[in-house]
Amino acid sequence: MRVLVLNGSPTGEDSITLFTVKYIEKKFPNVTFETLHVGQRIRQYERDFAEAGEKLAAADLILFAYPVYTFLVPAQLHRFVELMKGSGMDLSGKFATQITTSKHFYDVTAHRFIEDNCGDMGLRCLRGLSADMEDLRTEQGRREAEAFFRFVLWQMEHGYAEPSPWGTTAPFLPVVPAPAEAAPAERKPGTVVIVTDRDEDGEDALGAMIERFRVKLPYETRVVNLRTFPFAGGCLGCFHCAADGTCVHKDGFDRYLRENIQTGAAIVYAYTIRDHAMGYRFKLYDDRQFCNGHRTVTMGKPVGYLVDGPLSREPNLQMLMEARSQVGGNYLAGIATDEAAPEREIDQLAETLAYAVENDYQQPKNFFGVGGLKIFRDLIYQMQGLMRADHKFYKAHGFYDDFPQKHRGRIGAMYLVGALMKNKKLQKKMGGRMTEGVTLPYRKVLEDADKR
């Protein structure tokens, strides 16, 4: 059996994920493995896809191996998926699976991205392995990697695969331009940045959405089109920026980001759905923001989305947008699409975003935000010697304050309550008054509110 490994890491042979693949290769000597370093050599495959096409055609199993970069695959692998789908070659019926290494920060959205695109190509997708970066160094991690691939072979032998979720696509509605008189008589101070990757040649649905939003928003807007920025390449995972936030690429993106985008009072992302995501350029933009490390430098600023395409059929993309705003500490003012009622949704987004900016409106984090930041908190605390700027930022903003071992008073109180609850006589005497005791601090809040 022939396995083609698509190594999506820009570090090539030095990829931690690839070491897991090599370990599996040693454990299954009767299986032939071949690796394409698509992350490191993406420019080569952009120029000539023929070699990759031949390797893909000859493979029985296509194995995507990559580190998770900002919720998804590295931008270089995202681009290779585009090339696969654009090549026109027939891969239907072949098996595909994936191996990732990360600290489990939104590995689920990365895996779903690959699964969805495999479904588009008619590949029979098998559930992948999501490993911690340190797993291969442990006996359990090595055992899990070997068991994973043995299970993959069993599934292939029996012809099993994950079901494809796709059905039909609903038609989209053209956006009606807002008349000039619909614009506010006077703009409020502050600028909202609209980041897009649209092709500005000719009229398109996304352009109409952006224009209506700009008319209805009571703030000045600045459009930043990623197509016009001369990206030298994607994030290389080299950690050159860990010390002072300066990227190893000399294209000036780090300065451009901080001066032209992060200075806005709010940020709106406008895109057309491509390959179940925001498109390759937006992934390039996301990955290159690692010049900010794990620092949520725009927290407190609201965000919004203008989406051209069938968002209702993209649950993974919906989760990604909400999770990104939650982790970043940005209030998600809304997502307007051109599926059902585009004018109403765009107008509502404009008004809601304006309210959030004017009133500095923020909400507490949900599971996406709390869970994601706890992973980052633990990671940065362990790696503070390398990621010094991140560590300094986390200390200054109280990200370490919720370490459970710091709340010794609460821990001691729970021990006391637990000991009291063991006393049967006391428990019987208290009856249902336990909940009354729990609510005492909350009752005091209401009493204090009455006094004010």
Identify what each model region corresponds to.
Residues 1-87, 146-153, 164-291, 347-355, ...:
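N-terminal beta1-alpha1-beta2 submodule of the flavodoxin-like/Rossmannoid cofactor-binding fold
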Residues 13, 43-45, 106, 135, ...:
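Generic structural signal for helix capping and beta-alpha/helix-loop junctions
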Residues 86-89, 105, 116-124, 154, ...:
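Alpha-helix capping at helix-to-loop junctions
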Residues 87-92, 292-300:
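Short, conserved loop/helix-junction motifs that constitute active-site signature segments
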Residues 92-133, 299-343:
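Short, glycine-/small-residue-rich phosphate/pyrophosphate-handling segment
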Residues 109-110, 140, 205-206, 280, ...:
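A short secondary-structure junction signal
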Residues 120-167, 327-361:
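A charged, well-structured terminal subsegment
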Residues 258-261, 295-298, 324:
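Short, conserved, surface-exposed binding loops centered on an aromatic residue
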